[in-house]
Amino acid sequence: MLLSISCSKSDNIDQLKGFELWESLNINDYNMTQTISCFCFPYEFTQPKDIEVENNLIISIDGKNPTETIGYSSFMTINELFDFIESKLNDQPEFYEIEYNEEYGYPEILYFDMSKMIADEEIGYNIFNFKITN
């Protein structure tokens, strides 16, 4: 795994290196478990969610239609996570951490603290139990 901790905007391109591997593998259908780390309510929102992706779209979260899941719009496909990373890096966070999967290139762990002077605006995602389904 690649661990990257940085606060420099010039490192943004390096932080998306996992994307090159991910994109080259052309993975469109997969399952994963995703957690969101934030100061969010209700508590259920931050619990691990089993996500099924087909054609790069979330088709189920914990076996249900995504729209039946609390905060469903905050759960992301791998491609959406890469877009999220790029957006957050462009906003120049004070601290961030990203770990990429060596085999597939997707982000396994990402965490952003945009301002150390503001409480409760940090956000993180963890991806595990990744499995290609097609």
Q: Where are these predicted regions, by residue range?
A:
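Bacterial Sec-dependent N-terminal signal peptides
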Residues: 1-23
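A short, Trp-centered hydrophobic/proline-enriched beta-strand micro-motif
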Residues: 25-37
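Short, solvent-exposed loop/hinge segments that bridge or flank secondary-structure elements
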Residues: 36-54
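Short, surface-exposed coil-to-beta transition loops
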Residues: 43-48, 93, 120-124
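Mature extracytoplasmic domains of secretory-pathway proteins
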Residues: 52-96
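Helix-rich interaction surfaces within compact, conserved domain-sized segments
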Residues: 92-113
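Short, exposed beta-strand-loop hairpins at the edges of beta-sheets
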Residues: 107-125
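Short, low-complexity, Pro/Ser/Thr/Gly-rich segments in the mature regions of secreted, periplasmic
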Residues: 123-134
